[in-house]
Amino acid sequence: MGELREFVSPLHRATKRDYLARMNDDKVKCMLKAKEYAFEYWDGDRRYGYGGYEFRPGYWYPVAKSLIETYNLKSGSKVLDVGCGKGFLLHELLILEPGLLVTGTDISEYGLSHATDLVKPHLIKHDARGEFKWGDKEFDLVISLTMIHNLRAFELENCLRQIQRIGKSHYVTAESYRNELEQFNLQCWALTCETSFDFDEWLWMFEKSGYTGDFEFIYFE
């Protein structure tokens, strides 16, 4: 099994969240709308998702820098981001290392169509619940940030197997919890989560799926 990383957590912890307000705001309706992954999820009211997910130059810079340094990415390295959304992390990767060969996939046509001009040519629509068309170890690095928990357990297992197969190195981030308070906060906040695991359950899933890459968990403290 790979190493426990902390690339995304500092950004996650910097955001303030009102957990009870989210839970009490007609949450089932909001969940159904969020799972369309269309305008409301990305750029609509906060009750449906991001509440306006716009490109902020430099926001993803620390994560991009950590990925480049940790995985020794250089000109010609091939990177795949599974569930890339609007591709903002890939944008920062290309700013830092223009010679990278990046590919981003997502299920959301809206998200992909609202990527920056720099990365839009490198993005394709793909459902992570299905098969991955790429060959074994085709990418130097395969990443997936805060997407895999949106898959049901059997879909998640398949996705992790595919990520393992097509990458030489791997890194995934998922929502998780370490105690009852964090579990409650996650249940209040999550709109699209299909698989809610604690730390040990995630390690079990990694072993079950044969995933040996690095990982990170974000917690709702």
Question: Which residue ranges define each predicted feature?
Answer:
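Class I (Rossmann-like) S-adenosyl-L-methionine-dependent methyltransferase catalytic domain
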Residues: M1-Y71, K78-G135, L151-R165, S169-E221
